[in-house]
Design a protein with these regions (language model features):
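C-terminal, well-structured subdomains that either form a transmembrane helix-short loop-helix hairpin
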Residues: 92-113, 190-193, 198, 202, ...
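Cytochrome P450 heme-binding "Cys pocket" and the immediately downstream C-terminal segment
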Residues: 123-127, 253, 278-282, 288, ...
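Cytochrome P450 I-helix active-site segment
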Residues: 50-53, 121-173, 198-199, 229-230, ...
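Cytochrome P450 catalytic-domain helical core, especially the substrate-recognition surface
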Residues: 1-39, 138, 371-373
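Conserved cytochrome P450 K-helix/beta-meander segment immediately N-terminal to the heme-binding cysteine loop
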Residues: 205-273
Length: 387
């Protein structure tokens, strides 16, 4: 964290707008975090515990809560120095808060954003999601939904397939950094051959490339691009049928996809057993192994929960204002609506595929957004007729 901040400070005087914006963001972030930190320290010292999942409060209490409680209950021990030192330094608390917010919130928000955009571009998939949500929840209000009763149906159905496909196409992190221990070389097996990685070597796992490698994924000729495979296309249906690239059915998961190790977090697979399960290492939106994302199940539940709430009552359509106004759309035939929506789809796909990475993958450049309309179910102009 210190190295990152030092880099920002060293570039603030560069005549580059991005550098100045990064520095300004750091200054604002530091101010907000210091204010929140001071507030949580005061609450911890007073023995206050707020409701909900308070990240900063939990970190602060791990260092200040127990110490202050002991000081109040046993002042003599505190004077003798028997009160332990904080488990985390102030810098550790602020650094961990930064990591948790970026890794645990921005990545999830990006995935929700991309999922909504992909479903707006793929109305047929959106209708399938709505049908599934209706079958599972009906008109039951979200506050009455039960995790244990519904999570497996969501993970193993169309909504889970949409999430998996979105993460395959637009993973939060496109290059996962790894390195070989400095003490010795590391030998790995690649296509049956031993490959030696030198000690201290830095390696980046190319998430985008492995997620689109026809060697590991069921694929067909693309109906969108005309290419011989459709791995650049958003196609959640590929997860619903367990088939290999030669068209034969895959009944069981590949042995190398098994993950029985307990690394302290959710220890299941990244995908549901009811869906297509790629060979281990070919699907890594949450990384893999001992340093894989500990919050992956929480992220999956948050994303699917948001999507289910939205599509229980609403539809999302691409805005076509660039090509036709509302009055013109009302006068269109279905074929004319499909034609104008196709233009919006083509532009939206181009925009999304232009996403870039600054910490995480998102729409940083121009235009930086995909215009959409959120309408109640039954009031759609395009989503009910376009595939």
């Amino acid at each position: 964290m210190t190295e990152i901040m030092a880099s920002l400070i060293s570039t603030v005087h560069l005549p580059v707008q991005g550098a100045r914006q990064a520095y300004e963001s750091w200054v604002n972030w530091t101010q907000y975090m210091n204010e929140l930190f001071a507030q949580k320290v005061e609450e911890a010292r007073e023995g206050k515990h707020g409701e909900g999942m308070d990240i900063m409060g939990s970190l602060v209490r791990s260092s200040y809560g127990e110490k202050e409680a002991l000081r109040k209950s046993s002042p003599g021990r505190a004077e003798k120095g028997e009160v332990g030192k904080p488990k985390l330094s102030d810098s550790d608390i602020l650094g961990n808060a930064f990591v948790m917010i970026v890794a645990g919130h921005e990545t999830t928000a990006n995935s929700i954003h991309f999922s909504l955009m992909e479903l707006a571009m793929s109305p047929r998939a959106q209708r399938a999601v709505q049908k599934e949500v209706q079958a599972i929840f009906g008109d039951e209000p979200p506050e009455n939904w039960e995790y244990d009763a519904n999570i497996n149906n969501l993970l193993g159905g169309m909504l889970g397939a949409v999430l998996n496909e979105q993460l395959r196409l637009m993973p939060p992190v496109i290059a996962i950094p790894k390195h070989v221990t400095k003490s010795q070389d590391q030998v790995i097996i690649l296509d049956g051959k031993k490959v030696t990685l030198p000690a201290g070597a830095h390696i980046a796992l190319d998430t985008i490339a492995v997620h689109r490698n026809p060697r590991y994924w069921p694929t067909q000729p693309s109906k969108i691009t005309g290419r011989e495979h459709d791995l650049d296309d958003f196609k959640p249906e590929r997860w619903l049928v367990k088939i290999t690239s030669d068209g034969t059915q895959q009944i069981d998961s590949a042995p190398e996809s098994e993950d029985e190790e307990d690394f302290g977090g959710f220890t299941g697979h990244d995908t549901s057993a009811q869906l297509f399960r790629p060979v281990r290492g070919s699907y890594i939106p949450f990384s893999d192994g001992a340093r894989s994302c500990l919050g992956r199940r929480l992220a999956q539940v948050k994303i699917m929960g948001v999507l289910a709430v939205i599509f229980q009552k609403y539809s999302i359509e691409l805005a076509v204002d660039e090509w036709a106004n509302d009055d013109e759309v009302m006068m269109m035939t279905n074929d004319e609506k499909k034609a104008v929506y196709k233009k919006a789809q083509e532009k939206a796909r181009k925009t999304l595929r232009g996403a870039t990475t600054i910490l995480t993958l998102k729409l940083h450049g121009q235009p930086g957004f995909v215009p959409v309309r959120v309408v109640r179910k039954g009031e759609e102009r395009f989503a009910n007729i376009v595939d």
